[in-house]
Amino acid sequence: FYGALCYFISLAIPPFNSEGFSFLTLLERMYPGNWWFLMEYIVLILLSPMLNKSIENIDSKTFRLYIILLLIVNVGIGYCLNDRVNKTGYNIMNFIMLYYIGRFLNRNFEQHVAYLKRKWLWLVYILSSAMLFIGFIILSKYMDSTRIALKWFGYNNPLVLISSVAFFLIFALTKMKNSVVINTIAASTLVVYICHSSNFSMSPIIRAIFAKVNGWYDFPLSYVCLLGYAIVVFAVIVGFDVSMKTIIRKVKLIFK
């Protein structure tokens, strides 16, 4: 639905409507394979019964061994050695590793997680995120290597994994006062991904607008602008998705 919607919106904007309407293009943009994350997520769901079976009756020691082996393959061999088995983490191999890590933390929450202090997790998250940011600045500006700079944010970069797990644990240890708001936003994050990513959706429009805004600022401030722009895009898409769901619910009630 959102792939088609983004296509029709792009048709209404002259700079992105050079070829006119094409039914084949419409079908192509509705195909989930255009978004790597969505396709890998679907595959992970299909594999989840098998993955659950593989860890159903194993002890924590064996479970840890599984995760260590996956880290060696995905991070050590894939990312650090730049092997084609998993160079960037944008594939099902990395999803399986993250799935195992999540299941391990869930199964051993009281033993390995419950005693952790959120302030130390925040420190780990901030430090790892800062190292990612500084590394990107150095690689992109001072070493002038866009390819390596983009690889720096690979999903199997150790710093990305550390910051992600720390952030996940912070939320796992936080008692939410208004879980309805959190759940509503979480339910719309996939729509944000579909609308903002890939050349098959709104990505060209978003990039063009940001390129124009980015040109108004010097380099240091451009990253602040990027953060603000990302927040605005996220808020607009989430707001639109929530509105669409409300309208659809009301329409269903009318025809019920």
Predicted features by range, described:
Residues 25-40, 79-98, 133-165, 222-231:
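Interfacial loop-to-helix transition and helix-capping segments at the boundaries
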Residues 43-47, 51-54, 97-109, 160-175, ...:
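Transmembrane alpha-helical segments
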Residues 62-110:
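Loop-centered beta-sheet repeat module
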Residues 7-11, 67-78, 123-140, 164-169, ...:
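Hydrophobic core of alpha-helical transmembrane segments in multi-pass integral membrane proteins
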Residues 45-70, 104-124:
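Solvent-exposed interhelical
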Residues 204-218, 243-256:
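Membrane-proximal cytoplasmic C-terminal regulatory module of class A 7TM GPCRs
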Residues 112-191, 198-206, 213-226:
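Alpha-helical transmembrane segments and terminal signal-anchor/GPI-anchor hydrophobic tails
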Residues 1-33, 39-40, 44, 124, ...:
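Transmembrane alpha-helical segments and their boundary/interface "anchor" motifs
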